[in-house]
Swiss-Prot record:
GO terms, biological process: tRNA wobble uridine modification
Keywords for the protein's UniProt record, in alphabetical order: S-adenosyl-L-methionine, Transferase
PANTHER family named in the record: CARBOXY-S-ADENOSYL-L-METHIONINE SYNTHASE (PTHR43861:SF2), TRANS-ACONITATE 2-METHYLTRANSFERASE-RELATED (PTHR43861)
Protein name: Carboxy-S-adenosyl-L-methionine synthase
Amino acid sequence: MSKDTLFSAPIEKLGDFIFDESVAEVFPDMIQRSVPGYSNIITAIGMLASRFVTDQSNVYDLGCSRGAGILSIRRNVEKAGVRIIGVDNSEPMVERCRRHLEAYHSDIPVEILCDDIRHVEIKNASMVVLNFTLQFLPREDRLALLRKIYQGLNPNGVLVLSEKFTFEDNTINELLIDLHHTFKRANGYSELEVSQKRTALENVMRTDSIDTHKARLKEAGFSQVDLWFQCFNFGSMITIK
């Protein structure tokens, strides 16, 4: 696994964060060291798949990156006729995802698409995963995507939505941001790396509060919505149709 050193040296003209070749190469290391609880969420996605994925249905991972979520799902599904569709708009991510999945044998067919998740049809779905993806969409596009997911889910289908959160209480919000930065430093990132990456993400990742997510999911049609995992200002929600 390649180590993430992308922000270790001063960058004179720091642009917006993009999921390009350099990020795709180090992504597994980057996300493990940057997102508290990421491994737990990936493991639990597999557990949820074993409960919710049904025979002759589709599973979607929207923003699949290098395929960690898909692998977890595939290892835990024993139903007949299941098809997994992974979507990511980064060609370098898609290329690595395909190679990664090919390294592990499975009888469950997987299709990896390089596309905008807003343009992908959701149909006959027993499970949809949005793992730290929605926060990169323009806010005005989020409800429409969630409505499309709701309409494409079968009854009793599940949506797993993992996100970085903001908190309405400013004291709590600043505390959790600081704890997250402490977590990153404990994982070997320098103060410069933490600062430069935060700046690069400012214009591309727009986070919402848990209450905002819940209200939006309910507006999209979901009635059963709750938080099942949280570590600092990162967490995951489960919604059932």
